[in-house]
Amino acid sequence: MKKLFFITLAILSLSFTTAKADNDRVISKEKLPANTLQFISTHFAGLKISYVKEERDLFEKNYQVVFTDGTKLEFQRNGEWKEIDCRYSQVPAAIIPEAIKKYVREHYTNEKFLQIDHDRNDYEVKLSNRLELTFDKKFNIIDIDD
C-alpha cells in the first residue's frame, strides 16, 4: 500500500510539473513593470525589441526581453534585472557594479563584459575571453571558470 501511494504521488507530481512547465506567453512591452521599462529606455534605448515574454513557473514570474540584435534581458517579478546577455555586443558599463569593473580592469585589461547575472548571493559575469567570474555579495571573487 505504501509503495502504491508513493508511485501515485510521483506520477501526480510529475504530471503537475509538466503541466506548469510551459506557461510562457508573449506580451506587449507596455505590460512590463514601470522600473523595467525605465531600465530598458536608460540602458538599451538604441535597440529594437523583437519580443517580450512573461515566464511563469510554479512559484515565480519572470520577464524576458529579446532585442533584434540578439541581446536578452531577464527581469524578476518586481522589475529588477536578473540577467543581461549581450552575446554580440557588450553589457552597458553603467549596469556593472564598480568593484567588478575594477577587478576586471586590473586582471583582464582588454576584455569586455558579454553577460552578467545576479541573485541574492552572487554576481556572475562572462567576459569576451569566455571566462566566467563569480563574485559574492561583497564583490569578492569566489570562482573563475573557463
Model feature map: region roles:
Residues 1-24, 40:
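Bacterial Sec-dependent N-terminal signal peptides
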Residues 22-146:
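Interaction-mediating elements
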